């Protein structure tokens, strides 16, 4: 099993070679870069090529990119204007599509295979106009991504338009060939199903089209992005759910949120906690 980490852990700061050194030193072999311009300036070729060199120097593979979720420079600004493929207003939708094209075009100088994308914001309500907007945007993006060797993977979230059943119905009805899913276990654990059924019932509609996974834990109330086993997810059950996917060797990306504050552990300690959690996860996986 390849050890993979999302750079979301460092999203509040610029991603540097020193961070990559820490990631590699903690035993990870690949990364998913979370795209905010203050973290990684993906629209400047010089920055992209420098990142390619830094990843190669630390023997890290770029397995995926996470699309920006906000027009603001920092993902940590909660007041930021959402960058959404569901924009009903055409001008704003085209702006979002152009920004996502820039992320896809990173593959020209820094190859990667999957772009992880949210279906709108965290509170996106289901609306036929938004659905049509998403279809129009994705139709163009899938074609553009295909030429770059990138698969678009829409992630399940806690919004109505990010609900797994909604996402599967969207794909079945629009027949968007090539669209895939990123299954986020932490988000699934926040669904409205009874706790013991949340993961299976969230995974079931997406199962045949899941191409990647985000691993993180929470206590079933908010999106905490904790290391596995630090929340209330039943990980042996979660592993059985993941192993039911038709695609073998799914990329499993650990997506942690940085703990901050005077008494917070250092980033190095948080990386160590992630590594320890993955040791336990892999041991359980092999026994299941």
Role assignments for model-derived ranges:
Residues 41-44, 48, 86-93, 124-131, ...:
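Flexible, glycine- and charge-enriched loops at secondary-structure boundaries
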Residues 1-3, 13-24, 164-288:
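Histidine-acidic metal/acid-base catalytic patches
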Residues 3-7, 31-33, 62-67, 115-117, ...:
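Hydrophobic faces of well-ordered beta-strands that scaffold small-molecule active sites
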Residues 1-102, 108, 180, 208, ...:
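N-terminal pre-domain/capping segments
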Residues 9-11, 35-37, 68-71, 121-123, ...:
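Active-site-proximal loop/turn and secondary-structure-junction residues that shape catalytic pockets
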Residues 17, 74-181:
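Active-site acidic/histidine proton-transfer and metal-coordination neighborhood
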Residues 49-67, 135-147, 173-174, 235-240:
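Alpha-helix-loop-beta-strand connector modules within alpha/beta enzyme cores
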């Amino acid at each position: 099993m390849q050890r993979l980490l999302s750079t979301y852990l460092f999203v509040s700061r610029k991603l540097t070679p020193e961070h990559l050194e820490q990631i590699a030193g903690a035993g990870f072999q690949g990364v998913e870069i979370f795209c905010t311009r203050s973290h990684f300036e993906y629209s400047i070729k010089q920055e992209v090529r420098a990142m390619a060199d830094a990843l190669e120097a630390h023997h890290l593979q770029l397995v995926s990119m996470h699309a920006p979720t906000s027009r603001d420079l920092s993902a940590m600004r909660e007041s930021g204007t959402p960058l959404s493929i569901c924009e009903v207003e055409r001008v704003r939708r085209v702006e979002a599509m152009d920004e996502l094209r820039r992320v896809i075009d990173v593959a020209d100088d820094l190859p990667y295979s999957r772009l992880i994308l949210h279906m709108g914001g965290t509170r996106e309500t289901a609306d036929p106009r938004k659905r049509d907007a998403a279809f129009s945007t994705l139709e163009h993006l899938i074609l553009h991504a295909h030429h770059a060797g990138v698969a678009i993977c829409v992630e399940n979230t806690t919004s109505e338009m990010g609900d797994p059943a909604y996402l599967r119905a969207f794909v079945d009805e629009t027949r968007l060939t090539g669209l895939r899913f990123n299954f986020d276990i932490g988000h699934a654990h926040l669904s409205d199903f009874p706790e013991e059924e949340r993961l299976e019932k969230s995974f079931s509609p997406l199962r045949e089209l899941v191409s990647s996974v985000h691993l993180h834990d929470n206590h079933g109330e908010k999106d905490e992005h904790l290391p596995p086993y630090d929340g209330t997810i039943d990980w042996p059950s979660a592993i059985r759910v993941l192993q039911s996917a038709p695609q073998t060797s799914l990329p499993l990306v650990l997506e942690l949120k940085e703990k901050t504050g005077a008494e917070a552990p250092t980033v190095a300690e948080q990386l160590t906690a992630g590594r320890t959690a993955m040791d336990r996860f892999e041991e359980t996986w092999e026994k299941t």
